[in-house]
Regions:
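A conserved regulatory-domain signal marking ACT and ACT-like small-molecule sensing domains
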Residues: 78, 83-197
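Structured core elements
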Residues: 16-17, 31, 54, 64-66, ...
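Short acidic (Asp/Glu) and glycine-rich catalytic loops that position anionic groups and cofactors
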Residues: 56-63, 113
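Substrate-binding/catalytic subdomain of NAD(P)-dependent oxidoreductase enzymes
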Residues: 1-45, 50
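A short, polar/proline- and glycine-enriched secondary-structure boundary/capping micro-motif
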Residues: 43, 74-78
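Glycine-rich phosphate/pyrophosphate-binding beta-alpha loops
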Residues: 61-63, 67-73
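A glycine- and small/hydrophobic-rich beta-loop-beta segment
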Residues: 52, 58-60, 93-94
Length: 197
């Protein structure tokens, strides 16, 4: 929503739809979601039809691959090119290795992974609401790094933005579920994870 884009901008972030894939101890963690990224980061500068892939490996560090890949023309061109190459036999192993050489990996939930997050709550502007919200954070062991309350007297509600310290994804989701069921909530809460780079 526009309010989240504006809030992100004020906090020094941009919102990007990012995909992540990590291999840790033979376990694959994959996720795709909107992410708050610092405006100063490289990935924040990728706009328009450009896409980027950042590979972080040991000992080489980060490698960046960037090119056109969004929008109807760029996407169609890339798909037709890849399919043509595979059909012509130019790409023998589309996944870089033969099917026999592939090994089975375990896919893991991100519930136990830790993230810093941006949460926004639209609530009735009345006494006790803020303390009720912060108590739910405390009960779920989610530490608040920053809290911003923007009252809107004409509509008698308030927008509360919370930035958290690193917390378990499972705990962040519990906070959202417990708060959204409260009678003082006027709109579904928003959660956006914050990227580290």
């Amino acid at each position: 929503e526009k309010i989240d884009i504006d809030n992100a901008n004020k906090l020094g972030y941009k919102i990007k739809l990012l995909g992540f894939s990590e291999l840790i101890n033979n376990q694959v963690f994959q996720r795709v979601h909107p992410t708050l990224i610092k405006k100063s980061s490289y990935i924040a500068s990728i706009d328009g039809v450009l896409n980027a892939v950042i590979v972080d490996g040991y000992p080489v560090g980060q490698s960046v691959i960037q090119g056109e890949g969004a929008g109807p023309e760029a996407t169609t061109s890339a798909l037709v090119s890849d399919i043509s190459s595979i059909l012509r036999g130019n790409i023998k192993f589309p996944f870089s290795i033969s099917n026999k050489e592939r090994k089975k990996l375990n896919y893991k939930s991100i519930d136990d992974r830790y993230f810093s997050a941006y949460l926004r709550f639209e609530v009735l502007d009345k006494p006790g609401v803020l303390s009720n919200i912060t108590n739910i954070f405390s009960k779920n062991k989610v530490s608040i790094k920053r809290l911003i309350q923007n009252p809107n007297k004409s509509k008698k509600f308030s927008s509360i933005v919370v930035i958290t310290h690193n917390s378990k994804n499972k705990s962040l989701n519990k906070v959202i579920k417990q708060i959204e069921n409260k009678s003082f909530v006027v709109k579904k809460p928003k959660l956006i994870r914050i990227g580290s780079s």
